[in-house]
């Protein structure tokens, strides 16, 4: 960028690699901007716009620096992510958060979220927001349309993935905002809908502080 971006948003990558059948993003090949380029764009926002925060845009931040053709289980590249966020914070911004990330990606490496939280100074007065695609609580639908959204986990583990990811994120001062898809491909049955409702209800009951 050559002029300040809206809300301090800076793109760090394009594409996803998870292959969900309802998403056009999966048609794009994965491409990444280097930490050096990201840092320079944030500095434009600081110097020309006086923006003291960096809103980091990606389609799934947890695949940054990953090659999905060789990383079949979609494990995050923790080193690349730590390098990226270290570069971001070195600009002097007071706050940063990614736009999007998968729930499975947040827990595939148990050290990832705690380490990133330390780098970004996440805490009670500095919460990190992230948008995550829950999409459906239906095991049938998630397996049919988005099985790699759960990688490295299996479709039958979806409810556990959702609950464990919310727990991990919240414990490290990350606040996920969920998206849901109603009537997925005109294939959603009443039972699929109730399965989603049950998952959300269980999440609320089991993690009331989430």
Predicted regions and their residues:
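Acidic, low-complexity intrinsically disordered segments
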Residues: 1-37
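An active-site-proximal structural segment forming one wall of the substrate-binding cleft
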Residues: 39, 45-46, 201-205
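A short small-residue
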Residues: 23, 177-180
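Conserved SAM/AdoMet-binding glycine-rich loop
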Residues: 43-175, 182-190
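Auxiliary Fe-S-binding modules of radical SAM enzymes
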Residues: 194-210
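Short intrinsically disordered, low-complexity coil segments enriched in acidic
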Residues: 1-5, 179, 210
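Conserved, mostly hydrophobic/aromatic
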Residues: 16, 38, 132, 200
